[in-house]
UniProtKB/Swiss-Prot annotation:
GO terms for molecular function: rRNA binding; structural constituent of ribosome. This is Small ribosomal subunit protein uS8. PROSITE patterns: RIBOSOMAL_S8. Belongs to the universal ribosomal protein uS8 family. InterPro entries: Ribosomal_uS8, Ribosomal_uS8_CS, Ribosomal_uS8_sf.
Amino acid sequence: MSMQDPIADMLTRIRNGQAANKVSVKMPSAKLKVAIAKLLKEEGYIADYAVADEAKPELEITLKYFQGQPVVETIQRVSRPGLRIYKGKNELPKVMGGLGVAIVSTSKGLMTDRAARLAGMGGEVICYVA
């Protein structure tokens, strides 16, 4: 059976991996997943990521901890295949009062809510991370 929501699966693997204090998590790779992992690394929520070039490419995310606690407090899917959530530039949410980030898919690619506001763009809200 095929996966209905690969992004939700990725976020769940990260959440479960940190709950179990794993060093890293592996999942099937896709361009959108790699773009999300890149943003998470830039924002400091994960330590690193790598794509293994094989017959079936695999994305490995190295999780990040601070004083034994997971850096990612919450990671939540917002827009999903059954209910897409789009927000304009003035409607983009501030996650945890600006302490977290919302990952937004815009016409210029994936970016954080802060970057989208600076660029004056709205888009599909993929997930919240705090």
